[in-house]
Amino acid sequence: MKKKIFAGAVTLLSVAVLAACSNSEGKDIVTMKGNTITVNEFYDQVKNNGAAQQVLLQMAIKDIFEEKYGKDVKDKDVKDAFEKSKTAYGTAFAQVLAQNGLTEDAYKEQIRTNMLVEYAVKKAAEKELTDENYKSAFENYTPEVTAQIIKVDSEDKGKEVLEKAKAEGADFSQIAKENSTDAATKEKGGEIKFDSGSTDVPDAVKKAAFALEENGVSDLVTVPDSQYSASYYIVKLVKKSEKSSNWKDYKDKLKKIIIAQKEKDTSFIQSVVAKELKDANIKVKDSAFQSVFAQYIETTGSSTSSSSAASSSKTSESSSAAESSSKEASSSAAE
């Protein structure tokens, strides 16, 4: 599923104006009969625009995180994420860039900035690996199961296949091979293994599987793909694992779950960004921009902005995500 990758995009014009004003304060931008528009006059208008304020916030975040974590984000990773996104959008990619006022280089910068924040968030999340958090994650953890799934694209098709799958003596493997649209499992008769921390299986499918007894077949499971479409799953549970009473038996898996949860936690991400901005001793000199920074740092005479600037740095989409184990490049863009 393609995800929005330019939710936090702003026009290059705003970026250029904010970057240039300090070097050309009195310069005329436009002249006309009886009047002129100077850089200062334009700046006074642009700086009160929400998109322009987000630009400045993103510029500050980029510079601060680049200074501290730049060596930890490789150019190859940025390039790979960019190419993955470009492939996902296909022939529409150039048009989407243009609609959002971005060049390819500007989009790569967005991806890099987001990766810098992702790295910082992951490092901060690793500090949350306390026994208490391990035990909390363990309480909600379901060990690996072996299941078979059939995925179809319409509810009518799903009902038709479900009737076959629940028929006495039904060969679920053969039904999956003949009907499933899931390329990763179809030729294996739908077989797949996952636990509650797996990110390559929809949550609704996991929930349905965990509720079954061995050899049980679920009802039709609806998984929304977007606002306007959905996929439909039928799940058969093949084998369950007994859950150990000792959380340490699952420590590696629980570690991944804890970190993944933190990477999707907007409040946690915002706290990481806030700490980095505070450590950088950032000061906001123009009162017009105080509100957008107030979510992260104390600014004299400012009030908290009603819109969340965390969207300019959060992971997806993820990480957002679901899909965090096989991220689309969209989760690498600043949202």
From Swiss-Prot:
Cell compartment(s), UniProt: Cell membrane
Annotated spans, Disordered: 300-335
Covalent lipid sites (S-diacylglycerol cysteine): 21
Primary localisation category: membrane
Domain PpiC: 142-239
Database matches in PROSITE patterns: PPIC_PPIASE_2, PROKAR_LIPOPROTEIN
EC number per UniProt: 5.2.1.8
Keyword Lipoprotein attributed: yes
Reaction it catalyzes: [protein]-peptidylproline (omega=180) = [protein]-peptidylproline (omega=0)
Name of the protein in its database record: Foldase protein PrsA
Organism: Streptococcus sanguinis (strain SK36)
Gene that encodes the chain: prsA
